[in-house]
Amino acid sequence: MNINPYFLFIDVPIQAAISTTFPYTGVPPYSHGTGTGYTIDTVIRTHEYSNKGKQYISDVTGCAMVDPTNGPLPEDNEPSAYAQLDCVLEALDRMDEEHPGLFQAASQNAMEALMVTTVDKLTQGRQTFDWTVCRNQPAATALNTTITSFRLNDLNGADKGGLVPFCQDIIDSLDKPEMTFFSVKNIKKKLPAKNRKGFLIKRIPMKVKDRITRVEYIKRALSLNTMTKDAERGKLKRRAIATAGIQIRGFVLVVENLAKNICENLEQSGLPVGGNEKKAKLSNAVAKMLSNCPPGGISMTVTGDNTKWNECLNPRIFLAMTERITRDSPIWFRDFCSIAPVLFSNKIARLGKGFMITSKTKRLKAQIPCPDLFNIPLERYNEETRAKLKKLKPFFNEEGTASLSPGMMMGMFNMLSTVLGVAALGIKNIGNREYLWDGLQSSDDFALFVNAKDEETCMEGINDFYRTCKLLGINMSKKKSYCNETGMFEFTSMFYRDGFVSNFAMELPSFGVAGVNESADMAIGMTIIKNNMINNGMGPATAQTAIQLFIADYRYTYKCHRGDSKVEGKRMKIIKELWENTKGRDGLLVADGGPNIYNLRNLHIPEIVLKYNLMDPEYKGRLLHPQNPFVGHLSIEGIKEADITPAHGPIKKMDYDAVSGTHSWRTKRNRSILNTDQRNMILEEQCYAKCCNLFEACFNSASYRKPVGQHSMLEAMAHRLRMDARLDYESGRMSKDDFEKAMAHLGEIGHI
């Protein structure tokens, strides 16, 4: 049956008509081809905003550097990055006065957390630039290659288990005259072809030792790899994002943790909270502003937009901020916190794959890798690219990278930049004029509230705020920010009008079928609808329609229409046969051609549980048979997580309940990867998985604790098994003979 999607809005209050204005249903745009152009754009723009700063050449890397701090004050409304350090420090002093003890407490907590953080913290995170192979790898792999390569250079800090000794190794590695590391080289072998004349050339990946000089190593350690940001809606042009290497990650982690401790205690910060907690914080801020409004006065709200937030910020400001925040901390911790901003102010951007050019006859295409961009005549590029390359020239390094000292890349210091934004909001007033401002800040997004006796004074306040921000290197966009009376604004895609407007249109893209497997998809679909009823004000009629839409979508995706429907097809043939031979047809899962019995009352129950008592015994036996090879019991234990992609903002993790049945299959990975140099990675992964399974067999999950101390996994397991064996022997569950055998085995293992 066809359902009109506008039924989704049957019982929604009028303000929520905002939901109808989001045309975000289809697939978002993905990038393809080279991202080099976007990265070069970022490099050029960032330098343009800072071009009146101090220019010099780095003693270490030989790169062209620009320092815009304390640069000339702007004379127009164009974006500029000339933050005045004394203004930044004064804003932080005011924050310190308003929140006595906050900086000390945050520093103390961050320091204590750092002392107990282990190296494995760095395995969290997605792609990481791996300096040994000069491309992105999963975070755990990049950490592993770094640690194994460090060992070749007598840097064994990681073996102590803590993050601090590993970070000490990173600092030491920057001073080594040369670094040895493992890289992967393809060795070509000529083999006679079996089925025809001639030879086959076979590539065999080999792990080889390689070495690079100090300068080359430092350049790699400071490199950020760049990609194009995917799935960004509502923009014509794509933009570049960056991935830092493992050397930078450990230091950034600590600074961000420090900033997070501060943000948690600032009422103006929209981070690190989210969801309903964030809404409560916002509502409080609005109520507070309205209650502070002078009698007969007016309260205005600016829905703010900052121009190029990241590109106008500067690592040197962040250095000043960490120094100020950690003022009362031990010197070693202050030094530790200063490393991330220092590394960032010397960062180098890798430019990606390079450009494609075509021959004059348009017959041949060639990819020009980044190191060779300037080795071919500029006339060969189109006009747009030619203009870009001319501007890039002063900052280009011969390895095909670009020096990028000013500016921050996307997503690197979200928390610390939020602290800077809140510092601007916390000033409240300049020169005791007759207005007061306050607001909310979440990374680059802000909302500004201004109270005053009349509209003109409010405007005066907004202009003063604009100028204050300029002094901190923040550029509020006059074109894109708009002002209303308080009570109606938007902040981080939450629309406020006398309360938060329900806006589930943002979630519409995630209402589809997730594509994990039939069992998980049903659970995820229902959980999303349930969550939207709880969090986004989705009404009952709407939810009922959403269930029907989802079931229709699910049946089309998995070609599992009802057994009594007229749909033809390979799978339908089997489903119809099952339908004919089943007595309790209500007990068939939707994936097996059964009816849908979900409604608003039972959304939270997994389908197998819901239909359990309606199933035929034979069907139930097949569906849930533990020996059935399709019942993936290991992969599902209680709660699972899925990645959900809303129309805006980052991918969200979502928990759902799942019961394991024959529909909980897991897909096999792509086989073509087995012939590449990543094969070693897969073999290592499998080895780790086996180790972890063995460890879990020794320690049941109830006895997991964060590892403290210097035991290896092997010693811990041997120790645990000895204890278990002794308990079994003493209680009579184990014979003397078996006990002695077990102890002998463990004795051998313990000495490997």
From Swiss-Prot:
Places the protein is found: Host nucleus; Host cytoplasm
Q: What is its main location?
A: host cell
Q: Which reaction does it catalyse?
A: RNA(n) + a ribonucleoside 5'-triphosphate = RNA(n+1) + diphosphate
Function summary: RNA-dependent RNA polymerase which is responsible for replication and transcription of virus RNA segments. The transcription of viral mRNAs occurs by a unique mechanism called cap-snatching. 5' methylated caps of cellular mRNAs are cleaved after 10-13 nucleotides by PA. In turn, these short capped RNAs are used as primers by PB1 for transcription of viral mRNAs. During virus replication, PB1 initiates RNA synthesis and copy vRNA into complementary RNA (cRNA) which in turn serves as a template for the production of more vRNAs.
Q: How does it assemble?
A: Influenza RNA polymerase is composed of three subunits: PB1, PB2 and PA. Interacts (via N-terminus) with PA (via C-terminus). Interacts (via C-terminus) with PB2 (via N-terminus); this interaction is essential for transcription initiation.
Similarity annotation: Belongs to the influenza viruses polymerase PB1 family.
Would you tell me the protein name for this molecule?
RNA-directed RNA polymerase catalytic subunit
